[in-house]
């Protein structure tokens, strides 16, 4: 089953991928408030779907691949977790490789996967990781950039 971006899914009349149906999300760029709001919406949707899941927040600036592996692994308290990774653009190579490997695994077996929601500020820093994760099956949620007055009205 091909994973479509949210824009492609809407154009084809398909439902928008959600935290309940897709284990790996990338919230990319745009207005910082809307970016944060998109992450919160995905997190709340995942918490409604999996009320017993533990929510873990990581900052890619100082998190390593061991912390990510531990966050997505089952714990004594719950079988799955909801992992929020902020500042994805600052992830080191080893963390990026670990995330890509987990994304491939999670997309192939979503019923047992933890939910991962990554937040990227946009720009070219970390673009290679975004491309690798998208290719591995992550759903990219591109956030609107409100630089023009017309965009702010909507």
Positions of predicted regions on the chain:
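Non-catalytic interfacial helical region
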Residues: 2-15, 19-25, 30-154
